[in-house]
Amino acid sequence: MSKRGRGGASGAKFRISLGLPVGAVMNCADNTGAKNLFVIAVSGIKGRLNRLPSAGVGDMFVASVKKGKPELRKKVLQAVVVRQRKQYRRIDGSSIYFEDNAGVIVNNKGEMKGSAITGPVTKECADLWPRIASNAGSIA
C-alpha cells in the first residue's frame, strides 16, 4: 500500500525548529468551541528510541481537547500547528517566533472544522494548508 501523503497539505515542507513535544498543551485558535489542545502524537514522525515526537509550524498532529465544549472533549481529533513560541529560521534568513503556541482542529483531509482563526497564521502553514490559509485573518 502506498502512503497517502500529508492530507490536504500542498507544497514542500522545510526543516524548522520543533517546539511542541508530545504532552504539550496549546491554545485552539479557531471558533469550534475548544479552548486548548493536548498533543497526543505527531503525524509522520518515525523517531528514535526514547525521543519524544515533536511538532512544529505546519505539522499535523493527533490532539484531544482539555478545555472547551463538552461535545469536543474526550475525543481524539486531528489538528495543525499555526503558531509556535520556539524561534525558527525562515528560508530568507529571518527568524520569527510568536507569543503563544496555537493550533486549529482539522479533519483527515486538512479541511478546518471551524470557520475562522483568531490571530496570525504563519506563512509556512498557509503555504502547506490552503484551507487554513483561506480562513486566516492575517498571515505572518
Swiss-Prot record:
UniProt entry tagged with the keyword Lipoprotein: no
Q: Does the keyword Signal apply?
A: no
SUPFAM superfamilies with a match to the protein in the record? Ribosomal protein L14 (SSF50193)
Listed A to Z, the keywords are: Ribonucleoprotein, Ribosomal protein
The cysteines joined by S-S bonds are: none
Pfam family of the protein (one): Ribosomal_L14
Can you quote a single GO CC term? cytosolic large ribosomal subunit
What CDD domains does the record tag this protein with? Ribosomal_uL14
User: Any idea which GO molecular function terms this record carries?
Assistant: large ribosomal subunit rRNA binding; structural constituent of ribosome
Gene Ontology BP term (one): translation
Q: Which domain of life is it from?
A: Eukaryota
Q: Which InterPro entries match?
A: Ribosomal_uL14 (IPR000218), Ribosomal_uL14_CS (IPR019972), Ribosomal_uL14_sf (IPR036853)
Family, according to the entry, reads as follows: Belongs to the universal ribosomal protein uL14 family.
User: Per its UniProt record, what HAMAP family does this chain match?
Assistant: Ribosomal_uL14
Q: Which PANTHER family match?
A: 50S/60S RIBOSOMAL PROTEIN L14/L23, LARGE RIBOSOMAL SUBUNIT PROTEIN UL14
> What protein is this chain from?
Large ribosomal subunit protein uL14
User: Which species?
Assistant: Brugia malayi (Filarial nematode worm)
